[in-house]
Amino acid sequence: MSTPAVHIENLSFAFDTATFHFGDAEVRPGEVVVLLGPSGAGKSTLMRLLRGELDPLEGAVHVVGEPVKTRKKILVLDESKAGWVPQLDDLQPMLTARENIAHHLLRLEEEEREQRVDDLVRAMQLQGQDQLPVRALSGGKRQRVSIAKAMANQPPVLLMDESLAQLDLRTKTSILIDVKQMVRDAQIAAILVLHDPSDALMIADQLWVIKDGALVQKGKPEDIVKAPESHAIAGLFDHINVVASTADIPGPWRLDGEEKWLFAHELPALEGAELLDSYTTPSGSLRRIRWNGYDLLQK
């Protein structure tokens, strides 16, 4: 089995009165991990720990087997370890897209530098626009340049913290598809914070769900959708995880005056359910049960 590109071990961080416990996790080359969770959950804090901006309270982050050094120990973050794409680009507007990418490759011989830039221009679909000043490019193209720039030194890890949040759906989807392909081709690891769970399901090999400063569930997207560990996690995918069915059955279908939603993950295990009533319908028998405060229909 390949060495993890990223390995976090017993990772925690404290800030004022807030404490974050991220525990253990790893990302392998060729994988895309997406962080999901509500605002303020700790996604950006975890990204800053991965990048080396913050010192952990406990634990460590390793990139390709080597511990990540923090900004306090070195003046400049090591971009050969992790490429970083911020939400708002930090490109030089007067330089061309190509010059912005090449700026991080000044130590290479000219021929090698030009070949590397050509490869990144193709990977990010910037052909024909790489000679334009970035101030003349659209927001989507600028972010493509930012991704190419982040990958200029061929780091084993790409980090993107809501870098595509300002883009329209079509542009964002197109970029995510190209990022996924680049990750596979280059066999790097990518960790992204995305706002929309639909985007996460499209691109992620793994999902890490962050809530209240903790990594509460991680795994393949399809596994988390099928078996979320809490109502809050199920709610992230409510467009696909709510059981969309109704039945014209007499009786009270409200609890404390409010309608109750039923999530798919609640169906398989109904231990301790209380039988309230049973009905015979043309399509078969139904049982009305109470389980964990919910009134449910069960065939």
Where are these regions (language model features)?
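Non-catalytic connector elements of ABC transporters
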Residues: 44, 250-299
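Helix-to-loop junction immediately C-terminal to a conserved catalytic motif
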Residues: 51
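ABC ATPase NBD coupling module
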Residues: 67-83, 107, 224, 228
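Conserved ABC ATPase "signature" region
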Residues: 112-129, 180-181
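Conserved ABC ATPase signature
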Residues: 133-137, 141-143
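A short, proline-enriched helix->beta-strand linker immediately N-terminal to the Walker B motif
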Residues: 152-156
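Conserved ABC ATPase "signature" C-loop
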Residues: 212-213
